[in-house]
Amino acid sequence: MSLIRCTTSKALKFRQLLKMAARTSVTTPVSREPFSIEDHSLHFKIERYWAAGMIPLIPTAYFIHTPAMDAVLTVAIVLHVHWGIAGVVSDYARPFVIGDTLARVARASVYIITVILLASLLHFNNSDVGLTKAFEMVWSL
């Protein structure tokens, strides 16, 4: 007696699962392009190199207080924060979890936060003592 024709409760559940699996299975086409939109390995490498490049940048910025160093440090921090927040949003604010509308709002808010942070830090660099001098003042307390 075959498992599918059996009328026990386990066999019925198994048949129902097979029917559900047949209805919900999706075939994903495989892209043959060398760099597809879904390939994030290059982006991941750039993020890692960027983070590694910030290791000598931060101590150097402590000793060099120029507007150019302020600008470089500002861009480095803003990009690092942007990629971090974008990663969190892409992991936890998926449309499947929170809905399409909230997922779009979350993705848009990442860019809004990034623009506000960049504008604020550039304004601070131009109208006040600058980022590197401010860090030195904080550490001298």
Swiss-Prot record:
GO terms for molecular function: heme binding; metal ion binding; ubiquinone binding. Keywords: Electron transport, Heme, Iron, Membrane, Metal-binding, Mitochondrion, Mitochondrion inner membrane, Transit peptide, Transmembrane, Transmembrane helix, Transport, Tricarboxylic acid cycle, Ubiquinone. Pathway: Carbohydrate metabolism; tricarboxylic acid cycle; fumarate from succinate (eukaryal route): step 1/1. Its cofactor is heme b. The chain crosses the membrane at residues 45-63, 69-89, 105-126. Residues 1-24 form a transit peptide. GO terms for cellular component: membrane protein complex; mitochondrial inner membrane. Residues 25-44, 90-104 are mitochondrial matrix. A ubiquinone binds at Y92. It is found in: Mitochondrion inner membrane. InterPro entries: CybS (IPR007992), SQR/QFR_C/D (IPR034804). Its main location: mitochondrion. GO terms for biological process: mitochondrial electron transport, succinate to ubiquinone; tricarboxylic acid cycle. The heme b is bound between the two transmembrane subunits CybS and CybL. Heme b binds at H80. Residues 64-68, 127-141 are mitochondrial intermembrane. The keyword Membrane applies. It is a multi-pass membrane protein. Belongs to the CybS family. Membrane-bound small subunit (CybS) of the mitochondrial electron transport chain complex II, which together with the membrane-bound large subunit (CybL), anchor the catalytic subunits to the inner mitochondria membrane. During the free-living egg-larvae stages, which occur in an aerobic environment, complex II acts as a succinate dehydrogenase by transferring electrons from succinate to ubiquinone. Component of the mitochondrial electron transport chain complex II composed of four subunits: a flavoprotein (Fp), an iron-sulfur protein (Ip), and a large cytochrome b (CybL) subunit and a small cytochrome b (CybS) subunit. There are 2 developmental stage-specific forms of complex II which have the Ip and CybL subunits in common. Complex II from the free-living larvae (aerobic environment) acts as a succinate dehydrogenase and is composed of the common subunit Ip and CybL and the stage specific subunits FpL and CybSL. This is Succinate dehydrogenase [ubiquinone] cytochrome b small subunit 2.
